[in-house]
């Protein structure tokens, strides 16, 4: 029994480095020093107080390819259908800026604070970035 326990522990310890190595993500798989780096001016836009009658609220996230390889946005998706997005589909050259523009339609939102995520996936060193829209929907005042 003691031999079996020793054998199991030895086997687990032998496989630990394999699991660690397999779990590492190499941002530069070719090892050639070229990689895209996506940097945003801000990752959160505070839309403030939105009245129920406000149909749409526009916003823009501005980023730059701070790497030395072309940047390709492979997936840009909001957390709800109340957000419509426009973003560049073509590769962004190193040093160039990009703009993710959108409109938030507040009609489907409940009154009170809200938080909506926008997931951006790309070939950058940080492959997944979460952008955030926050604000508060309030009822129209009765005058």
PLM-predicted stretches and their roles:
Residues 110-139:
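Terminal connector regions
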Residues 8-16:
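Bacterial N-terminal signal peptides
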Residues 21-66, 134-143:
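Beta-sheet-dominated interaction scaffolds and their linkers
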Residues 54-60, 107-117:
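Short, solvent-exposed loop/turn segments enriched in Ser/Thr/Gly
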Residues 68-97:
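Surface-exposed binding patches on compact interaction domains or structured appendages
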Residues 66-69, 108, 124:
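Short, acidic/polar linear motifs in exposed loop/turn regions
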């Amino acid at each position: 029994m003691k031999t079996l326990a020793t054998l199991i522990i030895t086997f687990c310890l032998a496989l630990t480095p394999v699991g660690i190595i397999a779990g590492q993500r190499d941002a530069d798989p070719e090892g050639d020093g070229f990689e895209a780096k996506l940097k945003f001016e801000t990752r959160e836009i505070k839309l403030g107080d939105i009245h129920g009658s406000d149909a749409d609220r526009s916003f823009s996230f501005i980023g730059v390819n701070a790497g030395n390889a072309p940047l390709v946005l492979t997936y840009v998706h909001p957390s709800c259908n109340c957000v419509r997005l426009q973003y560049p589909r073509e590769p962004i050259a190193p040093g160039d800026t990009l703009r993710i523009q959108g409109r938030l339609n507040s009609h489907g939102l409940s009154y009170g604070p809200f938080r909506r995520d926008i997931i951006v996936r790309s070939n950058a060193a940080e492959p997944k970035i979460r952008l955030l829209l926050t604000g508060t929907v309030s009822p129209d005042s009765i005058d």
